[in-house]
Amino acid sequence: MKTCTCLIRATFWQLRGVVPEYRYPDQVIFNLSAVCLMRGRTCLNVRKRGADHVILPGGKIEPGETPLEAAIREAREETCLVLDPADLTHLGTFDAPAANGDADGICCAVYVCDWQDSWPEPVPDSEIVEYEWTDLDHCHDDARQAPLLLGRVIPALQQRGLL
């Protein structure tokens, strides 16, 4: 039941006559988790092989994993960074249109973590072909940016005073 909170929230508002900002299509991927690695007013995005959009490091939550554990695992797999759970703050769980065609929409738990100067810059590999430090103040006109970042993460960062 917990995995469907975004869908339940959207249905709640629809039943009350409020049109949500994002309507769920037929195919939605739930159980996603991602990390917004912040360096100043930028965040690290990745572009996977064959993808058009850059996205936050993240992916599907495996059976038996918590969203936090999945975020840490995905960050390690995609950036080679070993993150300390104490350094991650849950920003929220957000619904958004999918960026790269695996589905029509997503529901994703997002965690924020400050970049440490001692960490090495990630290097592209067979899965991740590009890393990009996205300037969060000037990315709204960039068609390569994922709807999750533009429509959900940036507003949440601003609301919390993190941007």
PLM-predicted stretches and their roles:
Residues 6, 49-54, 125-163:
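Nudix hydrolase/Nudix homology domain
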